[in-house]
Design a protein with these regions (language model features):
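C-terminal ends of transmembrane helices
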Residues: 6-10, 77-93, 142-153, 196-207, ...
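The feature identifies polytopic integral membrane transport proteins across all domains of life
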Residues: 94-103, 123-135, 152-162
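Hydrophobic core segments of alpha-helical transmembrane domains in multi-pass membrane transport
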Residues: 22-34, 75-81, 111-113, 194-200, ...
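Predominantly late transmembrane helices and immediately cytosolic-facing juxtamembrane segments
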Residues: 1-15, 35, 208-218, 222, ...
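Short helical (or helix-break) motifs at transmembrane helix termini and adjacent helical loops
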Residues: 111-112, 133-159, 167-173
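Entry/N-cap segments of selected transmembrane alpha helices
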Residues: 86-113, 184-193
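Transmembrane alpha-helix boundary signature
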Residues: 33-45, 58-67, 78-94, 110-131
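Structural signature of hydrophobic alpha-helical transmembrane segments
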Residues: 65-76, 124-139, 180-193, 231-233
Length: 249
């Protein structure tokens, strides 16, 4: 099913060359616009609310949250599918190769956090921000890589993408455990139940698209309601998607 949903990894990065440039241009425009005399319009747009749903089932989010919670969940889903393929049958399929980005990501989180703590030891109120330097912006990481095109070996792109994903997941876990004060445990249990159902369908060899799609939406909804960042739902869904260890899978 992975091959059905997404194209091969090399093809993914060929398309990313164009999108990386668009991402860079969009970031520059956003920086200039938000710091200009009409910057208030930029923030007004981000804070504009849009709703979808019927009757009592309505999802009302600002443009900012549609981007951060919905579109980024889809982004994490697609990228995690690609990395999952590499862990199963690609560049990261051997244990030693798979361990390298994991170690790199852990070091990339621990070292900046440690430096921050050392610098801010004497100021108690700023010490609470130790998790800030541990995060990586995965979208920009992949965007910068894509700008280099074929000049960067595909194995290096895979490694850095895996490292960025693991680093981002680590940051989400840190936020969930150390910064989330209002976790909704009912939603957390429903999120876990949805994920277990997806895993069960996978183990049964069930490969139809719509059950995964429908339960995936529920998984996102429960994750969003739990107080954990919604992007984790994209990662969990990608992990549960069936994969056949062959090019025809």
């Amino acid at each position: 099913m992975i091959n059905y949903i997404t194209a091969p990894f090399k093809w993914f990065f060929k398309l990313e060359a164009a999108s990386g440039l668009i991402l860079l241009i969009a970031a520059i425009i956003a920086l200039l616009w938000s710091n200009s005399s009409v910057g208030y319009l930029y923030f007004d747009i981000l804070n504009t609310h849009f709703s979808i749903g019927i009757k009592n089932f309505i999802l009302d989010l600002s443009v900012l949250h549609w981007i951060n919670d919905v579109l980024m969940a889809v982004f994490f889903f697609v990228v995690t599918l690609e990395i999952k393929r590499e862990f199963i049958q690609g560049e990261l399929s051997r244990p030693k190769q798979a361990l390298l980005p994991i170690i790199g990501a852990v070091g990339g989180m621990a070292v900046p956090a440690a430096i921050y703590i050392i610098i801010n030891l004497e100021t108690g109120y700023t010490l609470k921000g130790w998790a800030i330097p541990s995060a990586t912006d995965i979208a920009f990481s992949i965007g910068v890589l894509s700008l280099l095109g074929s000049r960067v070996p595909i194995s290096l792109k895979i490694f850095l993408t895996a490292l960025a994903i693991i680093d981002d997941l680590g940051a989400i876990i840190i936020i969930a455990f150390f910064y989330s004060t209002e976790l909704q445990y009912t939603f957390l249990l429903l999120m876990l139940l949805s994920f277990l159902i997806l895993i069960f369908l996978n183990k049964l060899g069930f490969r139809r698209f719509f059950p995964y799609f429908f339960i995936g939406i529920l998984l996102w909804f429960f994750t969003h309601g739990s107080g954990i960042h919604s992007t984790i739902s994209g990662v969990l869904l990608a992990c549960a998607i069936p994969h056949k260890n062959s090019e025809k899978g």
